[in-house]
């Protein structure tokens, strides 16, 4: 039996980059303890605890369309529906009792 550590997803709307390209398909990996602990040291999280979601997702989303490495600026640029979709996926694959305050939007399905 093997442990699945990466999960594919398709964003409902998709991220539009600076050239106007749409990126919808991606991959998310299971979170590690470091993914939830290290962002707590980030000054952006200290001044705005809600920013934890942005940092954590930028660490665990390993691919989004043809983009290179994902960073917090890309996560900030997601449509709200897409952010909620990723939060829901994060909670589903990592269990409901994770430490990161990644919340789902009610009523959104995957």
Predicted regions, residues:
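Short, surface-exposed, charged amphipathic helix/loop patches that serve as local interaction elements
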Residues: 1-110
């Amino acid at each position: 039996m093997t442990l699945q550590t990466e999960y594919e997803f398709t964003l409902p709307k998709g991220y539009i980059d600076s050239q106007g390209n749409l990126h919808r398909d991606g991959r998310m990996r299971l979170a590690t303890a470091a993914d939830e602990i290290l962002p707590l040291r980030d000054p952006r999280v200290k001044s705005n605890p809600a920013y934890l979601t942005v940092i954590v997702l930028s660490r665990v989303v390993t691919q989004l369309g043809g983009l290179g490495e994902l960073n917090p600026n890309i996560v900030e640029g997601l449509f709200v529906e897409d952010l909620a979709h990723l939060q829901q996926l994060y909670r589903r694959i990592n269990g409901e009792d994770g430490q990161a305050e990644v919340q789902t939007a009610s009523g959104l399905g995957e």
